[in-house]
A protein has these predicted regions:
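Negatively charged, low-complexity tracts enriched in Asp/Glu with abundant Ser/Thr
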Residues: 1-33
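A short, sequence-level motif marking secondary-structure junctions
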Residues: 17, 44-51, 69-73
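Generic serine detector
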Residues: 18-20, 53, 95
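Amphipathic, interaction-prone secondary-structure segments
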Residues: 24-57
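Mixed-charge, Lys/Arg-enriched low-complexity segments
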Residues: 4-10, 61-96
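A general marker of short, structured functional hotspots
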Residues: 12, 18, 32, 37, ...
């Protein structure tokens, strides 16, 4: 039996090149972990309820739920709006 090993993406391949890129990722149920100004965040679309959760990693009190990716882009990452920095964040993991 022959196996194919698929290499991991590079950071450049994982980054969001546009706001639409992030929206599409969330539309298809993507899961994202990213760093902005030294703080780790996560965004995921849950199947149950079909809502998007965004929060600081391991900080449940910062979790907010949104119905659309446009709404999720209004989440504040520190003092910045996610919409303004999504193409600049350091993506650590991206499922889609």
């Amino acid at each position: 039996m022959k196996y194919t090993i698929v290499p991991a993406n590079t950071p450049e391949q994982d980054r969001f090149v546009s706001i639409s890129d992030f929206k599409e990722c969330m539309h298809w149920g993507g899961e994202v972990e990213f760093i902005w100004k030294g703080t780790r965040y996560g965004a995921v679309r849950y199947v149950q309820g079909n809502r998007i959760s965004v929060c600081g990693a391991n900080r449940q009190e910062t979790e907010r739920f949104y119905d659309t990716a446009d709404e999720a882009l209004e989440y504040m990452v520190g003092e910045d709006r996610l919409r303004d920095v999504i193409t600049k964040v350091e993506v650590r993991f991206r499922s889609i």
